[in-house]
């Protein structure tokens, strides 16, 4: 663990309780003499705290140091992924986070699984997964998450995003990944959706194999950092 997340990190004093307390003081057995590095995952600063008190159900921390320390990928990457199974989204989130993806937009394509609902509770769970990933890899800013109800909404929001499809030019490392790369579901895009893409750059993955949506995400995120 590179640091501990706390939404109020930077305050002169902090209280650690609940799941964080159990993890730090019962699982990891942090001692009172230890100092802890904390982040709020918003401002890029690393805050160092010492212990003022460790009680049975909470710990009180006192701020003793601050340093600017941003840890992010060199290039920004925005993936626009059609909704796939929730368990598969949760599985790839830590990988995308470690590869420096700056934003993940989810949308319901024509062939998306409609029984998979992306609501505020799901987005909150996704964010929790990302927080744990940041604590492990050291990333200093959270990945942005959002959801759209259909393809046209996503296209309207990102008019310069390119599309990953079977028929297109080989995806170059020089592509503008910050503008967004649209990745379809397992069944690909419908003919109607392909009609929406006529004015956009279309790319394909330079492999003879057909990748799952989650594999395509990891591939694009990796290429973006070359």
UniProtKB/Swiss-Prot annotation:
Q: What is this protein called?
A: Ribosomal RNA small subunit methyltransferase E
Q: Where in the cell is it found?
A: Cytoplasm
Q: Briefly, what is this protein's role?
A: Specifically methylates the N3 position of the uracil ring of uridine 1498 (m3U1498) in 16S rRNA. Acts on the fully assembled 30S ribosomal subunit.
* Chief location of this protein within or outside the cell: cytoplasm
Recorded hits in NCBIfam families, A to Z, give:
PRK11713.3-3 (NF008695), RsmE family RNA methyltransferase (TIGR00046)
Which keywords label this protein? Cytoplasm, Methyltransferase, rRNA processing, S-adenosyl-L-methionine, Transferase
> Per the similarity annotation, which family is this?
Belongs to the RNA methyltransferase RsmE family.
Question: Organism, per UniProt?
Answer: Helicobacter pylori (strain J99 / ATCC 700824) (Campylobacter pylori J99)
């Amino acid at each position: 663990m590179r640091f501990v997340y706390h939404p109020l990190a930077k305050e002169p004093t902090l209280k650690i309780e609940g799941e964080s307390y159990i993890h730090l003081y019962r699982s990891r057995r942090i001692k009172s003499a230890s100092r802890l590095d904390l982040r709020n995952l918003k401002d890029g600063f690393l805050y160092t705290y010492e212990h003022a008190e460790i009680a049975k159900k909470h710990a009180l921390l006192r701020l003793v140091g601050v340093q600017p320390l941003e840890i992010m990928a060199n290039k920004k990457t925005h993936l626009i992924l059609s909704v796939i199974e929730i368990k598969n989204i949760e599985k790839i989130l830590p990988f995308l986070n470690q590869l420096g993806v700056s934003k993940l937009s989810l949308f319901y394509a024509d062939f998306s699984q409609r029984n998979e609902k992306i609501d505020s509770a799901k987005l909150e769970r996704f964010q929790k997964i990302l927080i744990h990933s940041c604590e492990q890899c050291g990333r200093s800013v959270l990945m942005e998450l959002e959801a759209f109800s259909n393809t046209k909404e996503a296209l309207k929001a990102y008019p310069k995003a390119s599309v990953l499809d079977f028929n297109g030019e080989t995806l170059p490392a020089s592509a503008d990944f910050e503008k967004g790369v649209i990745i379809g579901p397992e069944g690909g895009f419908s003919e109607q959706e392909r009609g929406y893409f006529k004015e956009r750059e279309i790319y394909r993955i330079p492999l003879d194999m057909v990748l799952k949506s989650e594999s395509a995400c990891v591939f694009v995120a990796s290429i973006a950092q070359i």
